[in-house]
């Protein structure tokens, strides 16, 4: 459980398989009507809800930036207001497409090991290609220079990063990988691409966690009890707190290659260990 929660806190690429054959009865309303609620449904909700721990870690690590965003929302920081608008614009594609397609994608591909392994390999190749392009050309945006500050990001670039985040709906695709690659293509430096990715994750995961707490919170607690949920949040918080700052520093100096090769190794392991 602790290892799984650590992966989730790091926005890992390992998918959690639903246990669709196990069911429990849960009360749906005051009239004692009940419906079947699978352990798989509870586990899926759990995976999303414990991201509250990772959210808390990002808030602590980026509290100054978040404070500027808050000041911007009340008209006291122009740069904070611009960043808030960009984050909202980047969030909207995933919010809209997620509501329309997430359940369909999960139903069709959630248990498909080949789809997961393929996404791991394709994602790795994209990371290697984009990283080589960045290093060889010193720029990958249509602008003549690389953005050096999140203040330089435009609404159009933010929306583009938001569409990259939608790619993470495909099982085996990392949300952070997709948005960092999107940030590269938008012209951000590795450091600022990672920072924007984490801030966007704060918005996206907060919305997803809040939605699952409202829609599935009571049933999830009945299925899994409260202690594993609290433990999951704590472990996700600690692992994210330890990893995020290291990740940003490493990415600034070395780029994405290491994580691309990790995905390839992981894809091989997934096929060998879980393939049929």
Question: Which residue stretches match the model-derived regions?
Answer:
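Multi-pass membrane proteins that catalyze or facilitate reactions on polyprenyl-/lipid-phosphate substrates
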Residues: 1-276
């Amino acid at each position: 459980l602790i290892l799984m929660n650590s992966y989730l806190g790091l926005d890992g690429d390992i998918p959690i398989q639903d246990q669709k054959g196990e069911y429990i009865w849960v009360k749906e309303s005051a009239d004692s009507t009940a419906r079947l609620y699978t352990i798989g449904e509870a586990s899926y909700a759990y995976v999303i809800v414990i991201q509250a721990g990772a959210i808390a870690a990002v808030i602590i690590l980026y509290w100054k930036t978040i404070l500027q965003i808050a000041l911007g929302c009340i008209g006291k920081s122009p740069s904070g207001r611009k960043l808030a608008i960009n984050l909202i614009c980047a969030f909207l594609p995933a919010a809209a497409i997620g509501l329309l397609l997430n359940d369909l994608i999960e139903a069709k591909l959630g248990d498909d090991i080949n789809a997961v392994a393929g996404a791991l390999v394709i994602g790795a190749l994209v990371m290697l290609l984009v990283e080589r392009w960045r290093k060889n050309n010193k720029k990958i945006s249509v602008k003549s220079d690389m953005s050096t500050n999140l203040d330089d990001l435009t609404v159009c670039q933010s929306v583009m990063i938001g569409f990259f985040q939608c790619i993470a709906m495909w099982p085996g695709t990392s949300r952070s990988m997709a948005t960092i690659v999107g940030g590269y293509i938008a012209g951000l430096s590795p450091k600022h691409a990672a920072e924007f990715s984490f801030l966007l994750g704060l918005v996206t995961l907060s919305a997803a966690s809040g939605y699952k707490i409202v829609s599935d919170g009571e049933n999830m607690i009945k299925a899994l009890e409260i202690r594993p949920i609290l433990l999951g949040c704590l472990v996700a918080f600690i692992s994210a707190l330890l990893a995020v700052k290291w990740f940003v520093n490493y990415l600034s100096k070395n780029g994405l290659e290491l994580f691309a090769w990790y995905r390839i190794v992981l894809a091989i392991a997934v096929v060998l260990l879980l393939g049929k």
